[in-house]
């Protein structure tokens, strides 16, 4: 659902930032 998409988005951003 929307929450899953949001989590994926946050995970991708964290990955890019190297956090």
Curated annotation (Swiss-Prot):
<keyword id="KW-0964">Secreted</keyword>
<dbReference type="InterPro" id="IPR013157">
    <property type="entry name" value="Aurein_antimicrobial_peptide"/>
</dbReference>
<keyword id="KW-0878">Amphibian defense peptide</keyword>
<dbReference type="Pfam" id="PF08256">
    <property type="entry name" value="Antimicrobial20"/>
</dbReference>
<protein>
    <recommendedName>
        <fullName>Uperin-2.7</fullName>
    </recommendedName>
</protein>
<dbReference type="GO" id="GO:0005576">
    <property type="term" value="C:extracellular region"/>
</dbReference>
<dbReference type="GO" id="GO:0006952">
    <property type="term" value="P:defense response"/>
</dbReference>
């Amino acid at each position: 659902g929307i929450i899953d998409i949001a989590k994926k988005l946050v995970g991708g951003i964290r990955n890019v930032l190297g956090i």
